[in-house]
C-alpha cells in the first residue's frame, strides 16, 4: 500500500478585490451635477471650479458643463475644473 506523508498548509492564496479607482470622465466630456469624475486614494487630482471632493477624495461635478484638466502651480498640481454650460454655449 502506497503512503504519502501529508503536505503542510500554506498561508498564501488570497488577493484583495480591485477598488475600481481612476478617471471616470475625461476632458471635453459633458457632465451634469453629481457625476463622478475621478475616484482616487489621496489627492492625485485636485478640485477646481465646479468640482467637489468627497471624504474618500472622490472628485464629482457640482455644476453642468464640460470637463477641463489642467496642470497649474510650481508643484505641477493636476486640477479638474468644469467650464459651465452657459460659457460653453456662448463660445
Curated annotation (Swiss-Prot):
GO terms for cellular component: cytosolic large ribosomal subunit. InterPro entries: Ribosomal_bL27 (IPR001684), Ribosomal_bL27_CS (IPR018261). One of its GO terms (biological process) is translation. Keywords: Ribonucleoprotein, Ribosomal protein. GO terms for molecular function: structural constituent of ribosome. The keyword Ribonucleoprotein applies. Signal peptide: none annotated. Belongs to the bacterial ribosomal protein bL27 family. HAMAP family: Ribosomal_bL27 (MF_00539). NCBIfam families: L27. This is Large ribosomal subunit protein bL27. It comes from Pseudomonas syringae pv. tomato (strain ATCC BAA-871 / DC3000). The lineage of its organism: Bacteria, Pseudomonadati, Pseudomonadota, Gammaproteobacteria, Pseudomonadales.
Amino acid at each position: 500500500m502506497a503512503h504519502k506523508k501529508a503536505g503542510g498548509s500554506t498561508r498564501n492564496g488570497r488577493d484583495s478585490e480591485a477598488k475600481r479607482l481612476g478617471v471616470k470622465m475625461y476632458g471635453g466630456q459633458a457632465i451634469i451635477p453629481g457625476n463622478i469624475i475621478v475616484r482616487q486614494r489621496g489627492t492625485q487630482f485636485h478640485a477646481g471650479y465646479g468640482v467637489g471632493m468627497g471624504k474618500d477624495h472622490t472628485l464629482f461635478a457640482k455644476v453642468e458643463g464640460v470637463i477641463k484638466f489642467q496642470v497649474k502651480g510650481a508643484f505641477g498640481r493636476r486640477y479638474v475644473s468644469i467650464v459651465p454650460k452657459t460659457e460653453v454655449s456662448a463660445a
